């Protein structure tokens, strides 16, 4: 059995699994997410929302023995709503940044948030940005991927074409108007899972992760939820959820299968280096 190591080291799946119990002091947690960010959360035909982060929220509630009161709202109102006390914490996929860590607490990362290229199925794999030189890259207009691709247009030598939705940008690849589409890795993976005409290509690592945000006054709650997240990594739940919603199996080193020492994400404000062993049911 391996134990959590000091700051800067990690525990990988299979190296640690201890039995224990998690006790909650509340019957219900009010949480929120953006209900239009597929495949993390999206409307159901019968009402309500479904997706990776909906499953994540419900599994956290199940393991804590509490009800998760999930609100689907516009992204722009989520962080202010949490800070105002409307929500106990957010279950929306939230990119952890240095700026955000100054005003909020975060769990350790549970998913990588990278830039993923999609190409027509049968296209040879591209192993780096240089492989897209002279190609047309389609993007969702106004997105972070649009801005990023345009910032590299001269350096890489690609042409960027913007579309009103990422679905339209993917269709441009299928029709041959574009060589590749670039979007978030989870969004791209979901698109490939649903469409046999396209395939995943180069994945550009940003070094960033999705983590769960809490108010600065909630370190105990953050740590309690992080304990559950770590257990879900250790017992393969995150792997199963990734395969279900993204069609992708996490590889060693991915945030979905990596338990970090301490509480929070190493290197960011709010991180606690306190050694602990996840207590898993």
Question: Can you say where each PLM-predicted feature lies in the sequence?
Answer:
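Short helix-initiation/N-cap motifs at beta->coil->alpha
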Residues: 69-80, 124-125, 160-175, 206-208
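Extracytoplasmic small-molecule ligand-binding "clamshell" domains
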Residues: 26-94
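Hydrophobic residues within well-ordered alpha-helices
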Residues: 60, 82-83, 132, 173-174, ...
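A ligand-binding cleft/hinge motif common to bilobed small-molecule-binding domains
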Residues: 77-80, 92-102, 150-151, 172-206
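Periplasmic-binding protein-like
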Residues: 35, 111-119, 189-229, 248-270, ...
């Amino acid at each position: 059995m391996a134990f959590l190591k000091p700051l800067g080291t990690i525990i990988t799946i299979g190296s640690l699994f201890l039995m224990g119990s998690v006790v909650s002091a509340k019957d219900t947690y009010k949480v929120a997410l953006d209900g239009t960010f597929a495949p993390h959360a999206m409307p159901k035909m019968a009402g309500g929302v479904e997706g990776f982060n909906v499953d994540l929220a419900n599994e956290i509630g199940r393991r804590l023995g509490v009800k998760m009161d999930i609100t689907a709202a516009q992204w722009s109102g989520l962080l202010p709503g949490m800070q105002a006390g409307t929500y106990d914490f957010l279950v929306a996929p939230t990119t952890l940044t240095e700026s955000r860590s100054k005003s909020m607490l975060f769990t350790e990362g549970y998913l990588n948030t990278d830039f993923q290229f999609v190409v027509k199925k049968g296209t040879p794999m591209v192993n780096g940005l240089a492989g897209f030189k002279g190609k047309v890259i389609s993007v969702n207009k106004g997105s972070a991927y649009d801005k990023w691709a345009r910032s590299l247009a001269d350096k890489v030598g690609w042409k960027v074409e913007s579309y009103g939705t990422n679905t339209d940008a993917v269709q441009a690849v299928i029709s041959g108007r574009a060589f590749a589409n670039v979007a978030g890795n989870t969004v791209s993976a979901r698109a490939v899972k649903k469409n046999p005409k396209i395939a995943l290509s180069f994945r550009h690592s940003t070094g960033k992760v999705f983590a769960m945000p809490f108010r600065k006054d909630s370190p105990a709650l953050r740590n309690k939820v992080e304990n559950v997240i770590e257990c879900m990594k250790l017992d393969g739940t995150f792997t199963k959820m990734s395969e279900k919603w993204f069609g992708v199996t996490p590889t060693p080193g991915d945030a979905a299968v990596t338990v970090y020492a301490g509480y929070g994400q190493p290197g960011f404000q709010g991180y606690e280096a306190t050694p602990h062993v996840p207590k898993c049911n």
